[in-house]
Amino acid sequence: MRLAVGALLVCAVLGLCLAVPDKTVRWCAVSEHEATKCQSFRDHMKSVIPSDGPSVACVKKASYLDCIRAIAANEADAVTLDAGLVYDAYLAPNNLKPVVAEFYGSKEDPQTFYYAVAVVKKDSGFQMNQLRGKKSCHTGLGRSAGWNIPIGLLYCDLPEPRKPLEKAVANFFSGSCAPCADGTDFPQLCQLCPGCGCSTLNQYFGYSGAFKCLKDGAGDVAFVKHSTIFENLANKADRDQYELLCLDNTRKPVDEYKDCHLAQVPSHTVVARSMGGKEDLIWELLNQAQEHFGKDKSKEFQLFSSPHGKDLLFKDSAHGFLKVPPRMDAKMYLGYEYVTAIRNLREGTCPEATTDECKPVKWCALSHHERLKCDEWSVNSVGKIECVSAETTEDCIAKIMNGEADAMSLDGGFVYIAGKCGLVPVLAENYNKNDNCEDTPEAGYFAVAVVKKSASDLTWDNLKGKKSCHTAVGRTAGWNIPMGLLYNKINHCRFDEFFSEGCAPGSKKDSSLCKLCMGSGPNLCEPNNKEGYYGYTGAFRCLVEKGDVAFVKHQTVPQNTGGKNPDPWAKNLNEKDYELLCLDGTRKPVKEYANCHLARAPNHAVVTRKDKEACVHKILRQQQHLFGSNVTDCSGNFCLFRSETKDLLFRDDTVCLAKLHDRNTYEKYLGEEYVKAVGNLRKCSTSSLLEACTFRRP
């Protein structure tokens, strides 16, 4: 009996122990000096953190690669890496992700990235694709901004054989200064700086040295970071004598580096396992650590100081930590250009082909129905179009960002998110016939609030407590415009409390704004066609069957009434049974949308990466000539702007895809008023992708 009781007591104690979460972060150190600092870090954290708070344990390995492998094997939890090693950590089988970033500069203006740029003199007259035979200035062999990124991006232009790499680079440029290169084996790499010294004794070494090489006239182009020219030329008039080379073979002033750079390079980053990686615990630990032992916090122990070495555990120049948004994996964190450059150097692979030999455009499709239409398009395009699938629009945008997909057509709200993620609009959907459709992008369509005529007492001013129907969270007519106007009235983001219930696909599943949705099981309230109330037609159907008000485009009611939509729920509907809510509190017939709307919305637009812009433009214009609105019989032929259900890949009422001319950034395309309205609504954003992208491009 005593044994049984004892066993029960032991089990109870063990059970209690097992129930206590492991709050230890095992930090990986790569030298004796790092291990010593890690132990000091551990001991000082013990003195300031409660016993139930996070703690540090130290694991010593021989190298950063060993640390990466140890974390992947759950033998350690965290280590700080530079960008190149973050790439290694991300690769299978390691599958690590960035969780905390070091920042530099000030707390008010934290810098977590720098931009690698190509600087030239203003009067030199050549572009990025004309660098062959020019003289080049590099910060140093093997360094990110000065070598790895530019040479990685130029890799496929280098003369073959491309190994050894130094020889190929020497044969590409007519002369170079690449400090740290072997001047005996590759004399051309040291032609502009005799000796190729690997220290500041070489006047052309490092960022400032590479710029001096350009400034002195020794070289034609300097590969440096964006701040180099500002650090070396205080006078704006002097800076104006220089320009940046852009990847699209244009030039920009040196202060426009955010839109004209070779790659965005992240600061040193703490990585952890993608699954079960303790990322919240690591952040809790480091956030408390910077509060107690950050810059100018403590004399006993300093997190960003290395008395017995340099950059131990963390960079000495760091000012603090920022939490990396959860949506951001390593590929997104590093960025497409950086990953492309490093992959080219490591694997000997080549980036996008030139415009004259465009690779197929990989179109991103949402849902089963879109994929079916895309596959049909792919077959008819004879290899010009390939198809990639994703569950949500944001997943598609992420795939385009990292090169897994190339293009898709988006509502204005998602054009905004895509723009914040570095994508660009390339063609606009036009919805009205005119003689010059492809050359004249339209001003936009109208966002309207539709109600049943029978609900005669309902106005814009008494929507509180009513049942609402939205195209999806983040979309223009269905969310951004009406919720932006509503936010200005109620000054808070609790829209699920303002309406009694609704269907706004993309809302949290337990929200009242999912209660009216009709999707079954996991498809309920999903922002794709698996949710029956998704999109313009879906939101109108929601109004017909359950809701009080639907936020849609001005064409939605006419397109789904009078027998134009043969679906059972719509075939007997009449346009006259619906009215529009006007912002002045009145109502008008559906036909009077020009005088009764919430706002003018930008037309849907095709977006892509900057490097694919020319190819997407070229191929889509070819495709619409083959399969656009000039095809009259869609029963036996593929039609780009027709769908088995509704608005698949493009809006069904699209007449053509039009050139944007100078409206080729998301700000210019959407217009200042719309960008400002969506910017205000960002306070209410639940977009994890937008959070991740603004981390990269604040």
Swiss-Prot record:
* Signal peptide, first to last residue: 1-19
**At which residues is Phosphoserine found?**
389, 685
Q: Does the keyword Magnesium apply?
A: no
Protein species of origin: Pan troglodytes (Chimpanzee)
Offer a single GO CC term for the protein: recycling endosome
- The residues the record assigns to binding hydrogencarbonate 2 are 471, 475, 477-478
The gene coding this protein: TF
Q: Which Pfam families does the annotation name?
A: Transferrin
> What is the protein name stated in its UniProt record?
Serotransferrin
A single BP term in Gene Ontology: antibacterial humoral response
The modified positions for Dimethylated arginine read 42
Please classify the protein's predominant subcellular localization into one broad category. secreted
- List residues of the Transferrin-like domain: 25-347, 361-683
Quote the function comment for this protein.
Answer: Transferrins are iron binding transport proteins which can bind two Fe(3+) ions in association with the binding of an anion, usually bicarbonate. It is responsible for the transport of iron from sites of absorption and heme degradation to those of storage and utilization. Serum transferrin may also have a further role in stimulating cell proliferation.
Q: What InterPro entries does this protein's entry cite?
A: Serotransferrin_mammal (IPR030685), Transferrin (IPR016357), Transferrin-like_dom (IPR001156), Transferrin_Fe_BS (IPR018195)
Concerning SMART domains, the annotation shows:
TR_FER
Q: Which residues bind Fe(3+) 2?
A: 411, 445, 536, 604
